[in-house]
């Protein structure tokens, strides 16, 4: 029985050591996930696959740090794209029937996002 316990502990240790580490969300991921939204937000196309991107981002941003990163990236994008309809950006969560804990706006304080 003692040998079985040692083997079980060894197997568990190996699983912990080789388990993939969770990577933090990056602005590149946020941008690529929401790329289908750009034509819609610039009044150049339909909503299309945008909601799938919004829901995908919501699924990727599981931690407070990830949500703050996503917020910062969205805030930066909202400020840098000329011609972006900020009203559409702010209403995107409700349009796509998702709950994002912050407003997509250049004025959002991302440090307060939980």
From Swiss-Prot:
Belongs to the plant LTP family. One of its GO terms (molecular function) is lipid binding. Disulfide bonds join 27-73, 37-50, 51-96, 71-110. InterPro entries: Bifun_inhib/LTP/seed_sf, Bifunc_inhib/LTP/seed_store, Plant_nsLTP. It comes from Solanum pennellii. Plant non-specific lipid-transfer proteins transfer phospholipids as well as galactolipids across membranes. May play a role in wax or cutin deposition in the cell walls of expanding epidermal cells and certain secretory tissues. It comes from the Eukaryota. The keyword tRNA-binding does not apply. This is Non-specific lipid-transfer protein 2. The gene is LTP2. Residues 1-23 form the signal peptide. Keywords: Disulfide bond, Lipid-binding, Signal, Transport. SUPFAM superfamilies: Bifunctional inhibitor/lipid-transfer protein/seed storage 2S albumin. GO terms for biological process: lipid transport.
